[in-house]
């Protein structure tokens, strides 16, 4: 038997740091540098002083995630970090896992691979049935997140706006848990009854997440929130004799434990008495709504509503759940009309910290979720597809989210008006990079001669072995410029939205390798192009006010040259607009601060060195080359797959793994499991390991 505590650690023990009164163990591969120590000190001080809002203004490449990790560790309180999309959330999750390998770092994003909400189009009399595909891997990680919040204090949750959508009531969810301790008096029948109430399924042949099996006085439970760990409960004379964690694939016992808590298999599990109470209130609302339709002479709507609702009531009565049960969430939670639904935010303790990463994007997202959802549901209610109470199954309004905010730190290189209003003067700057790199020098030149001037600048950079990014306003302009530069002997490529992910990676690789020297694009700041070899960013028609030439967009685009020692940005325009003035002023201010810091500490800026070998298919060893090429081909294949195809591929691998296990081919099963983990990690950005809480 392997005791998990005896497994050797891949980390250097001397680099773990702890703080008084904090449950976190922070792994510091390097000490904070540049502006990081001061930013950490100010943020921790502000949190200690009870400040509701602070802003961390961190430039590209300044190590904002590392600063957040240090602040969380020193404050010693649970934290939630919001990200604007799944990709960034996965990146943050991966980084926080590196900094907190011994604490619970969790991932809470939408668990739908595909989601088509139910909707009605009155103009065409078209009803669209709800259709969705739930990703089991992400569902397991969501359950793991709420479990960690209920069990421990050393928790960091990385979430997207999915966290403001309704999930089960925390109080009722907590009431349903089953805690097992060695020596507890409980019969086998009681254990089975409790598991079935928590929506676990008995399955003697196909043992998977959310199921249990019974063999005499031994009950094996595969907890819904675990990916690779099940628990074996051995009873003797109606008493818990022993508890063991084991690998459900190989059956090998991993660890003996004294206590284990089994959580419900879904966030929407509800006690039987609550369901019966809800049935009564749903019937009352149905009668009221039918009376309204009859008075309005809307007989079709009345018949439709009665048929659909009575079918759902029958299912609730017999099974305890029905399709679309979330539309009755107000009745199940006992909330009043218009009350906000329970969300992940309600699972957070009152002293939790909130970090809003890329807050200038995130605030807009949080603001927009409620209105779109409501418009769709009002139509469903008006035409008799749903009861009016379905409108309360919704995301939080922004004002409601604000009311639930804990102490907040906005994190952005370009904070917007909302952050400025809320945080006011409480802005902590992280402008100085640990590498000593400074923001680019900015030149403003006339737009009338922009193409000729750009051509001469490109020739200078090419001679020095450096690369150039050029951003234009329109697709047509980008195509014409690419053609002109090519005719004048410049090795140039054009990056646009029609290029798929794999080709885009190849283009960036070729730019870094020097296969070509100039990359032309329209909205390069969105592409996330952090290429150290780029020493010049040219912004054509910078004086045309608009989304692509707004202050924040200009600052982000200029920042593309911030990873090179010779970084320069040229803004072509016949006048200096207000946005240009602000962007230049802010960049100059940051640059002056960075240079002063370097001079005071004798730091020589050093460029960011990213190994290009990461991209070149193994040149040293033929076998390695073949393996890397196959991995790259698999990765490219997965990138090109639709979400439905990815779901099918995961199911295929899972079936293959279980077939090997049934045939006692455990090495093959483990190999397929590793392949499955790689696929999940690539597609969802997280592999989902189990967090085991040591028995007290």
UniProtKB/Swiss-Prot annotation:
Work out whether the entry's keyword set contains DNA repair.
yes
Q: Which GO terms describe its molecular function?
A: ATP binding; ATP hydrolysis activity; DNA binding; excinuclease ABC activity
Q: Name one GO biological process term.
A: SOS response
Q: Supply the SUPFAM superfamilies for this chain.
A: C-terminal UvrC-binding domain of UvrB, P-loop containing nucleoside triphosphate hydrolases
Q: Which SMART domains match?
A: DEXDc, HELICc
Subcellular location per UniProt equals: Cytoplasm
Query: Matching PROSITE patterns, A to Z?
Result: HELICASE_ATP_BIND_1 (PS51192), HELICASE_CTER (PS51194), UVR (PS50151)
Primary localisation category:
cytoplasm
Is NAD one of the keywords? Answer: no
Record: residues binding ATP:
58-65
Question: What are the entry keywords?
Answer: ATP-binding, Cytoplasm, DNA damage, DNA excision, DNA repair, Excision nuclease, Nucleotide-binding, SOS response
Domain Helicase C-terminal, chain residue ranges per copy: 450-616
Ranges for domain Helicase ATP-binding? 45-434
Report one GO cellular component. Answer: cytoplasm
Q: Which residues cross the membrane?
A: none
**What InterPro entries is this protein classified in?**
Helicase/UvrB_N (IPR006935), Helicase_ATP-bd (IPR014001), Helicase_C-like (IPR001650), P-loop_NTPase (IPR027417), UVR_dom (IPR001943), UVR_dom_sf (IPR036876), UvrB (IPR004807), UvrB_inter (IPR041471)
Per the Swiss-Prot or TrEMBL annotation, the motif Beta-hairpin is positioned at: 111-134
NCBIfam families tied to this protein: PRK05298.1, uvrb
Protein's job:
The UvrABC repair system catalyzes the recognition and processing of DNA lesions. A damage recognition complex composed of 2 UvrA and 2 UvrB subunits scans DNA for abnormalities. Upon binding of the UvrA(2)B(2) complex to a putative damaged site, the DNA wraps around one UvrB monomer. DNA wrap is dependent on ATP binding by UvrB and probably causes local melting of the DNA helix, facilitating insertion of UvrB beta-hairpin between the DNA strands. Then UvrB probes one DNA strand for the presence of a lesion.
Its domain description in UniProt is: The beta-hairpin motif is involved in DNA binding.
Q: What is this protein identified as?
A: UvrABC system protein B
Organism equals Ralstonia nicotianae (strain ATCC BAA-1114 / GMI1000)
Which gene produces this protein? uvrB
